[in-house]
């Protein structure tokens, strides 16, 4: 009988990837990025270890929503004080801080525990093309858009 081999924490190699969010659908992009942050794309994926990679997302302000979500979708936040419910539409959030749209979408797809918080720290979202991680030599990732595989 074969025994499952587990990778040691010292042997985990973290790769860096860069993704251009321009013209990408929020949900489809978020699921792929969350998969990479968790490490599920690797052969040696282990659920109880953080062996995910770093992901840099550029052009976060150019991400797309389908339908009328730009005006109809509402983000809620409560300050935990009476009358403290705050609402923002996607259009308002995009003007204030476009990176929060993708960060929130991806964070909610990660585990809700210490490991999920550590995996979320490997996400780096930026408005525009510039980012400070050129020294890591990130590998460019492209995802097949729906309808492009014909």
UniProtKB/Swiss-Prot annotation:
Coiled coil location: none
Record's protein name: Large ribosomal subunit protein uL13
Disulfide pairings: none
UniProt-listed HAMAP family: Ribosomal_uL13 (MF_01366)
Record's keyword terms, sorted: Ribonucleoprotein, Ribosomal protein
Summary of subunit composition and partner proteins: Part of the 50S ribosomal subunit.
A Pfam family matched in the record: Ribosomal_L13
GO molecular function: mRNA binding; structural constituent of ribosome
InterPro entries: Ribosomal_uL13, Ribosomal_uL13_bac-type, Ribosomal_uL13_sf
Family: Belongs to the universal ribosomal protein uL13 family.
Role played: This protein is one of the early assembly proteins of the 50S ribosomal subunit, although it is not seen to bind rRNA by itself. It is important during the early stages of 50S assembly.
GO BP field: negative regulation of translation; translation
């Amino acid at each position: 009988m074969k025994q499952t081999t587990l990778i040691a924490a010292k042997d985990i190699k973290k790769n860096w990837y860069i993704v251009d969010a321009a013209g990408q659908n929020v949900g489809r992009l978020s699921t792929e990025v969350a998969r990479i942050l968790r490490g599920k794309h690797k052969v040696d994926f282990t659920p109880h270890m953080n062996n995910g990679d770093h992901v840099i997302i550029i052009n976060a302000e150019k991400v797309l929503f389908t339908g009328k979500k730009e005006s109809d979708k509402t983000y809620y936040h409560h300050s935990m004080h009476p009358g403290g419910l705050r609402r923002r539409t996607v259009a308002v959030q995009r003007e204030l801080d476009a990176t929060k749209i993708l960060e929130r979408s991806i964070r909610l797809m990660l585990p809700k525990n210490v490991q999920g918080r550590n995996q979320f720290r490997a996400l780096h979202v930026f408005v525009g093309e510039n980012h400070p991680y050129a020294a890591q030599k990130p590998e460019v990732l492209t995802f097949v858009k729906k309808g492009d595989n014909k």
